[in-house]
């Protein structure tokens, strides 16, 4: 039975409501969040979702910082926190044990909405998904996050929609887990996975072709190449090799079973060897598509820095997934907001403008006293409330 959510009980700033509205529209369809015992929930799912969005949007430094703000900040207490407030123990219990199914549901539905709202760039290259992994520093008590002796790390395996500029599918593992097994799980048929050299795997190349999935993956320059057919190379192009080949040694049982295309080009003295089964693109377009792989690197850097996604508020694998999905949802909401308000992609300039705009609207409405608008944070910067 779908959850039934009453209209939101507290008035918020117009800008915050505009940001939050796409998620709010999904709530009536969201699976019901139920208590696992006889005790009533201290936070319903909407409370949990809003608190986590608030955490990422306002760059709180820790979960304790967020709980303190939910208690002491006038706006957060009245507009973000549960009706009866929230204690630290109840907040962390909720994050570590509840809400993941609901967050995943909201995330999937937001991805569908974003795919309609955002224009597609690079349409001439087809649907491109950059795939990469990112390590998250963990603490020693997170025993599941195995990495190496005296060090704990978790790893996100993420697919990033290059055309839309948004994250797509993800998986979370310990830091030692390999990245190649997740390519097929992340990539949908008809899409093209764009990966660096760490994903070179000749068995993977064969299986992706058998599954009707495409790839543009850089390989090592010393890979054994068996020429099947040479393709024409345009004059004056940075491309110096374009052919149908088999990769690997039959003697060592590493050879691909299905021929693929191999394109090589030189940029600023560096040679790039790209394995692909995209035969509809020119060699120069293959080079262009591989260059776009850096968009996932840029996303990870921006996401970590400006939404504080890797400032852990949970230590269980479940809780970390809750935090990651909340960070992704926040990013998608910002993507929709920036497109609708400015016809632009997400940028820190627009995020800062949003924070200040929300603050100004609350001041004008007289929703809280000036004492609550200025909080000491890190380098005594202006603390913009939402």
Predicted region positions:
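Short Lys/Arg-enriched helix C-cap and helix-to-coil transition segments
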Residues: 101-113
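A short, well-structured juxtamembrane/interface segment
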Residues: 111-119, 178-180
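Single, function-defining residue in the core of a domain
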Residues: 1-65, 69, 96-98, 105-106, ...
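Major-groove recognition helix of helix-turn-helix-like DNA-binding domains
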Residues: 79-98
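Extended, structured, electrostatic nucleic-acid-contact surfaces
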Residues: 71-81
